């Protein structure tokens, strides 16, 4: 609307709108002057006049619009003065788009404005433009000042905040200093308070130690009572015989009741293991000692005595030796009998913390293995391990009985239904029968019962009942008797390479052998895996299981050292640490076992294993000559000679008096040598595991508990 009004004002020369009287009078006067002075306008060229008039018309239109807006939009507010300054600029820039050169030509032809008027209008327009520029500069300056003021205010606020933070920090420091001063003053005022607290802590520790001693005494009493109850239950079942004048058997008379030393030691370990677990729960849960121990231990011990195996009574001198031994170690009975403590190390699964004495072990047990979720989960895992081992044990027992039955039979005699027997089993006899007939004849194959080997009175050497008491299922006889591993693998290299049979070595021994066979005595983890699969067919399956065991052994044993080099991480063997570890674990005399020649076949190795088993079983008896009489010594020597194959058929009549001859002859046992079948589903078990163990060989049983835990990982 503003543009149209401007064009109409210029073209029609009627400037009567919005109080434009001054401009209209000027235009009338100019038109009159233009008509009278036509000579002057004719002198100017048309092009220059057209250009000049166009500029003057534009400036006049701008000035008219400015005057119109300033007169109509005035307000007393100071803040509104800046608004009319910005509007003329936009209008003046838009007006040239509306006024065309044709319209300017018409204005010049009609001679509305004279050149003098146009010059005056041009000067006015320049003045107006200068004012606009000044106003714009002033507006910019004001904006800059406002911006600077805002920045200054922000900086002041930040400085104030920083000052407040510094003041708060100073106040906090002052408060801390005041608190420290107060504490120092209190300590100065009460110097004996810390000493009193230390005394109270010492008293509490002494009370705990006294309570632990009381608990241990109660446990020992309960163990004795439970062992007596177990013996009574065995007497009721007819498994042992007690003289009529003896009502209750003490703990020291266990060997006279017909139990072997290994069975006594295993029974003792089971009872103390149950008590240690229940004692841990009692100290944290406030339970009663006398409620659960008898039922749980009786059930566990009776289950172990369930196989109906008959025993001979052991020689009379052994109980006195056990009594003397227990009297000498009575001050260490509590620490030695605890299942979770041995050789100064905590035997809790996955712990292996070093404890200097039994008191420190009890503190460690109460603090680290309390009744919490972790310990409960570990107990569940141990229950699963025990279940798996019981299943494996039943399979291995059946296999052992079948092997012994096969080796015990005569190959010429047909046997329709053979029954599993012991290699050297005993016949249940009364004392009168033993005195009148010290030696019994073997039964014929036509009788319904299986043939029994005739022996003189003496301890049973190998019985199925002794198998679960030896601790580990696979006895690493090469590790036990310090036989080099390479000497045993060499003759059977092809056998292990092709047959799916578990090699009778620990993972640590196999890893060391792999590293020692390498050229630079160092291997990466993948190279160790490759050696396992290349050397043994057994490790070509179940890779996840045994690879985890290999990694576990590498990180567990200190003899394996991890070294970083150009190839990456490699493993080496610290031979000093390895030999130190073996010397700590290996007990017993290796001279009792004959070295296995490398030139022998697998059958010869089997005979050598049987020799090692008999030597180990007779070790507690041979160590003390006072424990055996002439008959038992003759029996052991005869069995050794018989298994070595040195006796074929000696003394066909079979008459020898144990009282007259120190070495009575017995009927020969035909041992059939056959290689182990490679298609067995389970791992082979070394026959050394069938040997009975005495308390002196308890450390050997602990050595072999390691491979089982590795296999189950």
From Swiss-Prot:
Residues 386-407 are annotated as: Leucine-zipper. Residues 502-592 bind DNA. Residues 1-44, 283-337, 436-463, 647-666, 676-713 are annotated as: Disordered. It is found in: Nucleus. A zinc finger (C2H2-type) spans 344-369. PANTHER family: FORKHEAD BOX P, ISOFORM C, FORKHEAD BOX PROTEIN P2. The leucine-zipper is required for dimerization and transcriptional repression. This is Forkhead box protein P2. It comes from Gorilla gorilla gorilla (Western lowland gorilla).
